[in-house]
């Protein structure tokens, strides 16, 4: 029986019985005892024997018959899967009967026995609920190491890396001890440790730490060989993983690994190239597990991939290319033949592997014979199978899964028929590999003997530090038997806790009075107290345990919502003259640029309107889009715009609950008026937010006020009367509102001026632009710019050159000399048709004065407005803070007003919220300017809400492009055979930059369908981008607590992901972007990973028990035939609470212990890069005490070398880091002997 629904129902019944027994424990009836005995007697004798041996704790893992035998007889070639599958229903009935009879030892033995089989059915989560329930009912019940380790595997798959690391490190450090389990042999402990080391290697592989992962896999091989009888199954798995790692490993790392005197694998000595070594390792892996089809399928898939990659590399001699392709063909065919016609395939891992084998074989045929009709048909079938596979993996209905599984395998059968896959003759009909794969299994794969325990000692520091992070007391002391030796039990391993001691919103959120600001010091104490309290929470014999068990299942059966920390309370520690915390109740604001905060398109209006659901977020730690002011007196000059206020109604505020923060003086927000002009304009009050349901074209405005005040009301304005002596509108509130909208600002669309700004009131005073410089504002076309409050954008070295653009359909436009606009219109988002969508409330840095060539906020005083590059852009001109311009009398109709922005706020990053018409900001992922070199535009029909656009990803355009330009873009998007060869072999940044230069911008890729794609990985060590052909399915948007403003995130499943059962997230920009946005994101993240790897080594050398990891990121270039249709970045899904430790300018959160390590890492990156780079903008997942493991993502890098993206401030950013964030070296810096540089403020 392998029907998932039936299995799930039976397991649910077992869980319900346990739940009832946990609530009340009646005496066991004679009827229950006899039913238990009856069910056990009905089992086949082989299963009864296995249950008895499991009860006696005879082995820590249920062994295959062939697993430890050198000479395998006919009776040993039966797989355990077949035996368990045949009697599964009887076993589960016996499990229920044993629970009712209160024979927890027998029940735990059955759980142990069926564990691996149910993992293949994707229902391990429900089985683990039963195991935990047994432990809670009778804590002395032995729970097998295999079952405990299963929890670690599922945690890795679901993104709970901290949880998995703790379980594995506990077992390794405690010599395999878990609960009351007793080992019969010392070698069994070695086996458990070897498996744990192997899974830790897979975690590092998932994190892109190829060399370090390979070292751990090698260690596991040593452990398996150290057993009295080598574990062939363990060796097969480790060799396959090692080969898979070699595929991604750089040549330099491979040479280092190969030449390491402690690593003595013989297969490394036989081959010079890492891909050939990997292929041989897979051949050996398949031979070791020749009687288990899934193991063979996995191994030969990796072998075929290795040979495919090698045939495309520059190292492969041309005369040997076809030979290796034929070997790859054989490997994929062997994999496809592991499925017999009458055998069902019921698990995601096996289905994925079959689709991958079919695609690999199709790719080989294309390389050998070209794009024939047969190959094209097979390619289409593979994409069809990928779509069905994704639906299978996300479906919760057993009938659907069963039908989809059959459909997938039916498609695979068609591929086999198209490509004429023929079975091979084999003397041993039970073997799934050909005779040519046979080798002497007693062949030494190690030169000499490795000392496994000595190897473990080298990792003991890491395992100890991870264990120290978490509590080890069992939460169930109530029913503990006095004579039971509990040891390290599964409850102590935190298997019932969704998020282990990560810094969370619930731990950090203090109770705040509605109208009272809270000081930074008080808040810090509250946070520490809550962390201490939360870190010592023990689960009792109560509902809390059962609820948490349900949470574990959700992570396996279907993609769960993100659990992110955007609602967490953050405290700001600032150097300089700035005062303490400025807490704003901005539940719609997100303090990071990670994929944890990306948009999920649901209508959350009702949520926004609900009171009492506010999350406190420190808006001052957002990453800025432009620099902060050096001090209050050094504001930039602001240019005036001549436009007319048009159809704007302001509502009268209700200021009953508005009070200033205890730590901040009440500030007024002057509005900057402008001279009248005949063109209609746009007005925005200071800190205004866009209201829901506003009329089309003009939205209501809600006041946000300065961010360093605290308030909890919703002021709105029905009218605004102006007073010349006040410099601001009467009745205008000066406090932030608490709605869950996201911040935005309005930019008038007008051509850039010559920037001849005169000093009207002396230094630091802005002046109006002359009448001749008045620019147009387009009717009913406000440009809603979403300042994401995330990453500051550089203002240096950005040329400002403009073409004149006339578009008759827009009506009368007054043109300026050298004028232009940025044709960077957003694409339509899934929720873009909703009126008055949410926007985040957040202050904007006053230093952001103009918009650069990518829509960046730039400093208008530092940058000339013209050059010869022909870039189109918008310009935003603002008044410096503190300066009050003269205000006209009551009429405001002839003025455009810009807000005076909060001075202690880092600014914004791009986003494209519903209702936005033009997005002029840049996201934290910086990019170069080449993709913005746009063609001239002519009149034509529009699509969506905007009058212009580049050529979109489907090959059509919103307006007509000149024929020649359109042809050039389409040609640039079409990859030629030579391009494919270069990409598959590996290319450098410069080649890729030039090749993609004229591809234009792209709409977001289409979801809910499978695409052909190129997977591109970047190695900082080799500085190469290497491609791999694959198929990707773009799934549903993620359900997240907070919407992102610049990118959408969605589930992604592709054939060549590192972890078949793992979850991956794709990120795509909401608005049309050029390809290089994604590529620079990945380059920057992998550069930060390169630096942090070296930093970790230094920490380890100094016995500092902390390790930092950057989540790896890759590119998927979406293709249709050979034409580029889009681009997304992909990274593993990490589950946990997300925190932001610093930004890329001056803000840093010193109350987190992790920040100390992060700042030391930034300092180290500066020294390690020979004073060229500093990694900043620290954000990710940290533990409560800042020790153990820290996972980071989305960094920024200030570099003196490259200015390819505007979030790089160069020398100025490095100055900010050492003078504002890392003011003094900490203990970590001293222990690493880091030298503090002498910093002088760079000229701007």
Swiss-Prot record:
Span of domain Alpha-type protein kinase: 1017-1237
Basic and acidic residues biased stretches: 757-771
Broad class of the protein's primary localization: cytoplasm
Record EC number: 2.7.11.1
Top EC class for this record: transferase
Catalyzed chemical reaction(s): L-seryl-[protein] + ATP = O-phospho-L-seryl-[protein] + ADP + H(+); L-threonyl-[protein] + ATP = O-phospho-L-threonyl-[protein] + ADP + H(+)
Gene3D superfamilies named among the record's database cross-references: MHCK/EF2 kinase, Phosphorylase Kinase, domain 1
Residue ranges of the region described as Disordered: 650-675, 701-737, 757-798, 824-848
Disulfide-bond pairs as recorded: none
Binding site for ADP-D-glycero-beta-D-manno-heptose: 61, 67, 116, 150-153, 231, 233, 236-237, 295
Pfam families the UniProt entry points to: Alpha_kinase (PF02816)
Keyword field: Cell projection, Cilium biogenesis/degradation, Cytoplasm, Cytoskeleton, Disease variant, Immunity, Innate immunity, Kinase, Serine/threonine-protein kinase, Transferase
Annotated Polar residues bias: 652-675
PANTHER family reported for this sequence: ALPHA-PROTEIN KINASE 1
Function: Serine/threonine-protein kinase that detects bacterial pathogen-associated molecular pattern metabolites (PAMPs) and initiates an innate immune response, a critical step for pathogen elimination and engagement of adaptive immunity. Specifically recognizes and binds ADP-D-glycero-beta-D-manno-heptose (ADP-Heptose), a potent PAMP present in all Gram-negative and some Gram-positive bacteria. ADP-Heptose-binding stimulates its kinase activity to phosphorylate and activate TIFA, triggering pro-inflammatory NF-kappa-B signaling.
Name of protein: Alpha-protein kinase 1
């Amino acid at each position: 029986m392998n029907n998932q629904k039936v299995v799930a129902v039976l397991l649910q019944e077992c869980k319900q019985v346990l739940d009832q027994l946990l609530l009340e424990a009646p005496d066991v009836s004679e009827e229950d005892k006899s039913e238990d005995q009856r069910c056990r007697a009905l089992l086949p004798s082989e299963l009864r024997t296995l249950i008895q041996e499991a009860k006696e704790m005879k082995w820590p893992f249920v062994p295959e018959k062939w697993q430890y035998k050198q000479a395998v007889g006919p009776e040993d070639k039966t797989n355990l899967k077949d035996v368990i599958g045949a009697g599964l229903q009887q076993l589960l009935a016996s499990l229920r009967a044993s629970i009712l009879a209160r024979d927890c030892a027998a029940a735990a033995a059955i759980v142990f026995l069926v564990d691996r089989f149910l993992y293949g059915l994707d229902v391990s989560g429900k089985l683990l609920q039963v195991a935990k329930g047994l432990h809670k009912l009778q804590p002395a019940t032995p729970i097998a190491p295999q079952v405990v380790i299963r929890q670690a595997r599922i945690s890795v798959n679901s993104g709970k890396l901290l949880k998995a690391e703790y379980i594995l490190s506990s077992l390794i450090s405690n010599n395999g001890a878990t609960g009351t389990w007793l080992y019969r042999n010392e070698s069994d402990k070695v086996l458990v440790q070897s498996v744990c080391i192997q899974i830790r290697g897979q975690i590092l592989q998932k994190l892109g730490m190829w060399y370090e992962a390979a070292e751990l896999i090698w260690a596991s091989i040593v452990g398996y060989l150290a057993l009295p009888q080598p574990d062939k199954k363990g060796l097969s798995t480790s060799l396959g993983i090692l080969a898979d790692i070699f595929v991604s490993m750089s040549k330099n790392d491979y040479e280092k690994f190969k030449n390491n005197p402690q690593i003595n694998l013989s297969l490394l000595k036989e081959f010079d190239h890492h891909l050939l070594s990997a292929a041989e390792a897979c051949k050996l892996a398949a031979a070791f597990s020749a009687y288990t089809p899934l193991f063979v399928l996995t191994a030969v898939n990796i072998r075929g991939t290795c040979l495919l990659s090698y045939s495309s590399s520059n190292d492969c001699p041309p005369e040997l290319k076809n030979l290796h392709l034929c070997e790859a063909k054989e490997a994929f065919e062997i994999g496809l033949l592991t499925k017999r016609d009458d055998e069902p395939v019921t698990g995601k891992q096996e289905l994925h592997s079959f689709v991958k084998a079919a695609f690999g074989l199709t790719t080989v045929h294309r390389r050998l014979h070209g794009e024939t009709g047969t190959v094209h048909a097979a390619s289409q079938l593979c994409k069809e199978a990928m779509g069905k596979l994704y639906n299978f993996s996300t479906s919760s209905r057993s009938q659907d899964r069963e039908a989809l599984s059959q459909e997938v395998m039916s498609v695979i059968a068609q591929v086999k028929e198209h490509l004429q896959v023929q079975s091979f003759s084999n003397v041993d009909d039970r073997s799934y590999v050909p005779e040519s794969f046979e080798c002497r299994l007693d062949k030494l794969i190690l030169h000499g003997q490795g000392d496994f325990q000595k190897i473990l000692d080298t990792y003991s520091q890491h395992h100890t530090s991870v264990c120290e992070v978490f509590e080890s007391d069992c939460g169930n002391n109530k029913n503990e038997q006095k004579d039971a030796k509990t040891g390290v039990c599964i409850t102590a391993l935190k298997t019932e806790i969704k998020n282990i001691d990560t810094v969370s919103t619930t731990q950090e959120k203090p109770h705040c009075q509605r109208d009272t600001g809270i000081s930074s010091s008080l808040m810090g104490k509250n946070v520490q107290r809550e962390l201490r309290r939360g870190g010592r929470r023990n689960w009792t014999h109560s509902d809390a345990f059962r609820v948490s068990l349900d949470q574990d299942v959700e992570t396996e059966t279907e993609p769960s919502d993100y659990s992110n920390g955007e609602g967490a309370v953050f405290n700001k520690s600032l150097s300089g003259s700035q005062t303490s915390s400025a807490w704003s109740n901005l539940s719609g604001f997100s303090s990071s640029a990670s994929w944890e905060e990306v948009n999920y398109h649901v209508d959350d209006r009702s949520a926004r309107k609900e009171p009492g659901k506010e999350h406190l977020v420190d808006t001052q730690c957002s990453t800025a889009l432009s620099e902060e002011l050096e001090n209050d007196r050094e504001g930039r000059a602001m240019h005036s715009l001549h436009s007319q206020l048009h159809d704007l109604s302001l509502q009268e505020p209700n200021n009953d609950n508005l009070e200033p923060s205890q730590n901040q003086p009440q500030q007024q927000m002057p509005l900057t008026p402008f001279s009248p002009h005949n063109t209609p304009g746009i007005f925005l009050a200071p800190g205004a937010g866009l209201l829901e349901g506003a009329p089309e074209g003009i939205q209501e405005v809600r006041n946000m006020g300065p961010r360093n005040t605290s308030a909890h009301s919703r002021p709105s304005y029905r009218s605004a009367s102006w007073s010349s002596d006040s410099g601001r509108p009467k009745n205008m509130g000066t406090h932030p509102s608490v709605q869950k909208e996201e911040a935005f600002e309005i930019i008038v669309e007008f051509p850039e001026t010559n920037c001849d700004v005169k000093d009207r009131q002396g230094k630091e005073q802005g002046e109006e632009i002359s009448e001749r410089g008045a620019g147009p504002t387009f009717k009913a076309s406000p440009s809603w710019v979403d300042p994401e409050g995330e990453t500051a954008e550089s203002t240096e070295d950005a040329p400002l050159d403009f073409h004149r653009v006339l578009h008759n359909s827009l009506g009368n436009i007054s043109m300026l000399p050298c004028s232009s606009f940025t044709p960077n219109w957003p694409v339509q988002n899934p929720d873009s048709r909703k009126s008055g969508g949410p926007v985040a409330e957040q202050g904007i840095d006053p230093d952001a004065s103009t918009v650069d060539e990518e829509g960046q906020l730039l400093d208008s005083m530092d940058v000339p407005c013209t050059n010869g590059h022909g870039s189109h852009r918008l310009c935003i001109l603002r008044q410096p803070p503190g300066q009050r311009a003269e205000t006209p009398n009551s009429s405001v109709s002839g003025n455009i007003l810009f807000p005076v922005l909060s001075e202690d706020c880092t600014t914004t990053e791009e986003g494209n919220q519903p209702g936005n018409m033009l997005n002029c900001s840049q996201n934290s992922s910086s990019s170069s300017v080449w993709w913005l070199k746009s063609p001239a535009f002519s009149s034509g029909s529009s699509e969506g809400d905007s009058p212009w656009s580049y050529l979109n990803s489907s090959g059509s355009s919103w307006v007509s492009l000149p024929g020649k330009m359109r042809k050039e873009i389409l040609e640039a998007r079409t990859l030629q055979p030579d391009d494919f060869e270069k990409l598959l072999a590996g290319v450098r940044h410069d080649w890729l930059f030039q090749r993609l230069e004229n591809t234009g911008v792209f709409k977001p890729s289409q979801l809910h369908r499978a695409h052909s794609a190129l997977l591109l990985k970047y190695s900082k060590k080799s500085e190469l981008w290497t491609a791999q052909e694959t198929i990707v399915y773009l799934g549903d948007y993620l359900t997240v607590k907070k919407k992102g403003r610049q990118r959408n995130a969605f589930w992604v499943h592709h054939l060549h992901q590192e972890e078949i059962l793992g979850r991956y997230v794709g990120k795509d920009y909401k608005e049309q972007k050029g390809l290089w946005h994604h590529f620079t994101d990945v380059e920057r993240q992998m550069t930060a990973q390169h630096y942090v790897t070296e930093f970790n080594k230094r920490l380890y050398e100094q016995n500092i028990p902390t390790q930092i990891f950057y989540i790896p990121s890759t590119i998927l270039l979406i293709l249709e035939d050979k034409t580029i249709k889009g681009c997304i970045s992909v990274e593993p899904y990490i589950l946990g609470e997300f925190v932001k430790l610093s930004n890329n300018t001056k803000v840093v959160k010193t109350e987190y212990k992790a920040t100390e390590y992060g700042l030391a890492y930034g300092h180290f990156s500066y020294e390690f890069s020979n004073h060229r780079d500093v990694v900043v903008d620290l954000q990710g997942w940290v533990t409560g005490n800042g020790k153990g493991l820290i996972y980071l993502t989305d960094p920024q890098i200030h570099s003196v070398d490259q200015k390819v993206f505007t979030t790089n401030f160069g020398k100025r950013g490095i100055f900010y880091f050492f003078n504002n964030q890392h003011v003094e070296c900490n203990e970590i810096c001293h222990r690493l002997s880091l030298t503090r540089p002498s910093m002088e403020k760079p000229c701007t």
